[in-house]
Amino acid sequence: MDDQIILKHVTKRFTTKTLGTVTAVNDFNLSIKEGECFSFLGPSGCGKTTTLRMIAGFEDLSEGEIHLCGRPVSIKSQNLYVPPEHRGLGMVFQAFAVWPHMNVFENVAFPLTIKKVPKDEIVKRVNEAL
């Protein structure tokens, strides 16, 4: 099976007024194959959410590369950045709905709607996921 998510030397730094430059993720490498199940475990503040946000495209890398389904979506050294809506991912957030005016079904269906998946297929896939 091919690698579906690849992170190469991914680093994320933030600059704050009080602490200066803080490294949230440092030289992280990851390869996830199709069908694999995985989770990020670690204490608060260790970079789990930041890593997921970089994969989804909500945070830019400070260094490194991210590839999804065989195509590069973020390569800092080449100034390559594919926005979240063009990465082919959906994300369920841990705190509240992404769109509070939508119910759970509508929130889960939204990425499929954006991709213009037929309505009957959306209903089938969302029901399977929930």
Residue map of PLM features:
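Helix-to-loop junction immediately C-terminal to a conserved catalytic motif
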Residues: 56
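Short helical segment in ABC ATPase nucleotide-binding domains corresponding to the A-loop/adjacent helical element
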Residues: 93, 104-113, 123, 127
